[in-house]
Amino acid sequence: GDDRLNSRTFLRRVSKFTDKVKPVKSDFAMLDAQDSTVNRQLLLAAQILKSIDRDMPIRFLIAECDQASIVLSALALARYYGVEDQLDISPLFETPHALRNGGRVVEQMLEQPAYRNHVKKRGVIAVQTGFSDAGRFMGQIAAVLAVERLQSHLATAIAESGLTDMRALIFNTHGESNGRGSHPGTLTQRMDYIMSPWVFERFRSHKIALTHEFSFQGGDGFLWFGDDLLGEASLMQLLCARFKPTDTATQDEFYNDADFVWDFYNEVINQQDSLYHDDDYRYVLSGFARNFLIPSGSRPEIRQASGPLAQSTFTPRRIRAIPHNAILQQLAIPTNVIFGIGRAGRIDPNRFNMIFRNAPRGRTIMDMVLGSWQNTQLQVLAAYGDFQDPNFWISRAIAQGKKPTRWQYRLVAHQLYHRNANHSGLLWSAFRHP
């Protein structure tokens, strides 16, 4: 089980095994014969270093990583294919389990001699955090708090390991659950949202060099870098955001009331989890709104599943992040950002009001909630509900009189009667929780 894979004994065995691995010669024939994704990627890296650029560093991303043993195994394979010296292994923490336990995973990685020796050679400790996928799993607001906590734990783990002469590299994939670049504020506010001044101060206080990477993808790039003047202005905002003083960040009231923030965080997660398990919410996302979307890439919108999951009912967690966000925007109800905030605030309304109205970090987070709420239109959702109500189509059929098209309306109504048999009502019933 997972506990055994995370045990100190097992990790030490993997570390010792990694030290004993000898590199093999590889070629394109080996690459062509491989079916395993990880082997193909590392073999491709080997051929790039061999035939194109032997000095180029390569970032090796491990998606949905939640165990130190996975990183050590990737390191063993990198050594086997002879690419260890040019490879920075970057685990991506994006699932709820990974974000909650990412700090411990980093600690376990840094405890193992094989990994320590590797990062000493490379001079870099690289990780990646996912915002948009995390928002799909646990809600955007809980995700941003979990990501910040993980970033802080990384600084602590590096300091405690004695590797403060290494450079920490954090790449944030900041979809923010409303789409690329959806933060409602300025670029400076956006940068503070994905990595707070408090986190920068944590690394600075430990004397750890920090490289913060982020990307502008798709339309987000055109929005901020559409011409030379706009690009220069955007770069100036980014520089101002990253070189402003951070020494006062520790005085933020948001960090001085850890008990309330922790309770708030857990309640948002609980509310989001209850939403994902709501049958009516599943009904919403599996409706025809998904068919109105423009394809967002070469990958299918629904993740492929195997084993028992493949036979289970539809679950929102199987929708990829981009179409999931787009579906909620199509329905005008960005629940992955706003849902559960009110319930969490009821824990202590006075503290909630003070922290999220007055504390700088709290305001940064609440700006995202309020921006998403402005994009919420319950009338649009109700209209979709009418479309999935068979009575609506029956009324349309009656209005057709004796026209042949009346049978088309009746067919739609018939299909919806069967589809709705196991559900409690209209589309908007999924949002009955206040």
Give the residues covered by each predicted segment.
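Short helix-capping segments at alpha-helix termini
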Residues: 80-84, 161-162
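Carboxylate/His-rich catalytic cores and anion/metal-binding grooves
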Residues: 75-78, 95-115
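Acidic, glycine-enriched catalytic cores built around paired aspartates
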Residues: 1-30, 34, 38-54, 74, ...
